[in-house]
Amino acid sequence: MFKLLSKLLVYLTASIMAIASPLAFSVDSSGEYPTVSEIPVGEVRLYQIADGVWSHIATQSFDGAVYPSNGLIVRDGDELLLIDTAWGAKNTAALLAEIEKQIGLPVTRAVSTHFHDDRVGGVDVLRAAGVATYASPSTRRLAEVEGNEIPTHSLEGLSSSGDAVRFGPVELFYPGAAHSTDNLVVYVPSASVLYGGCAIYELSRTSAGNVADADLAEWPTSIERIQQHYPEAQFVIPGHGLPGGLDLLKHTTNVVKAHTNRSVVE
């Protein structure tokens, strides 16, 4: 009887802690997630996912349309780690101002997950603010070739598919080529948050979009590596649009394969 009561007490305690924990969020919290229509270009919104973890959301005009773009903010002691710029100098300056207003901790380091302007545009603003900017050697090289802003410091140990390195409160993972040959994903172990960047699509997206620098053949395999490496992820943030769960990975694979099949037929 005593053992039975002890087990029951442990179960009840764990249940109460799970309910009370700030990390016990629901993936359906994306219903409150800021959307493109709510964010004027030049402004930034922050969305708290868990204790010490936020996404940042900005919008940008491109080819006559306005698109949302996500990034990540993770607390690292009394400092903040920023993942990706807010797509441009004006947006990134607004991001730093919003962080100061809402969080009140300094951003000391920033990682760009690939070389496109929605990830590195604004690096110069960060550098001027005293933020140490990082990217893989591949991203830095491709950004230079593209004429984009170049993060200052190189992240080593991310050259081969499946490589992972710890960087403060997060793990950086190179799944292989997908949206671009250099794209990284970021995992926050303390909150089971996976930031997929542009390698992952939101559920409402049905077209592959910009695949000029993509490796369509390798993309599904790279997503499979992400799934295998982070099966415990609960909250998945795409590069653009609304977050969800691990179902975003399967959805992205389906969209990419459909695009590839159409291209073959055409």
UniProtKB/Swiss-Prot annotation:
Annotated signal peptide: 1-20
SUPFAM superfamilies associated with the record: Metallo-hydrolase/oxidoreductase
Effect of residue 87 to A: Reductions in catalytic efficiency, about 8-fold with respect to cefepime, about 20-fold with respect to cefotaxime and about 100-fold with respect to ceftazidime
Free-text activity regulation comment from the record: Inhibited by chelating agents such as EDTA. Inhibited by a fungal natural product, aspergillomarasmine A (AMA). Inhibited by 2-triazolylthioacetamides.
Documented EC number(s): 3.5.2.6
GO terms of biological process kind: response to antibiotic
Residues that coordinate or bind Zn(2+) 2: 198
Outcome of mutating residue 65 to W: Modest decrease in catalytic efficiency about 8-fold, with respect to ampicillin, and increase in catalytic efficiency about 9-fold, with respect to cefuroxime
Highest taxon of source: Bacteria
Top-tier EC class: hydrolase
One GO location term (cellular component): periplasmic space
Family: Belongs to the metallo-beta-lactamase superfamily. Class-B beta-lactamase family.
Protein name: Metallo-beta-lactamase VIM-2
Source organism: Escherichia coli
